[in-house]
């Protein structure tokens, strides 16, 4: 569960409603101490850092407020710091590829995977089922996230899962 997570009380609220993991983005940017505090209280497996990342002058930068505000932070440094301080998983959204349907940003994903050793969920860029197959055969990436491709009925979840399973990606059908 994510969105509007700014305090430990917000973690409490969603966990009491049944969430297993809590995703934090802007709340951690405003108060970086939220990551270690939440990890200490609930365990790092519960703390998911969500990062909206975009290239600015060749550098991966962290953005806030739904990708509208450049924080000036280097994304690789920020993500590494958060993992070192208790983020047990990363949800990495590429602003550059989000909604474009040209495939996941493998260069960005590789750069992050080289710096951390926690699960990475890739988000942004899926346009066809082959994009997911490429992602899931890519070293260091644990999961993929997509929305528009399903909302706009370009692909069904069932068809995607069947295709991936037929191509060697094990999953629950």
Predicted regions and their residues:
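Short, glycine/charged-enriched secondary-structure capping and boundary segments
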Residues: 14-16, 37-38, 61-65, 104-107, ...
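Alpha-helix-loop-beta-strand connector modules within alpha/beta enzyme cores
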Residues: 36-52, 101-128, 168-169
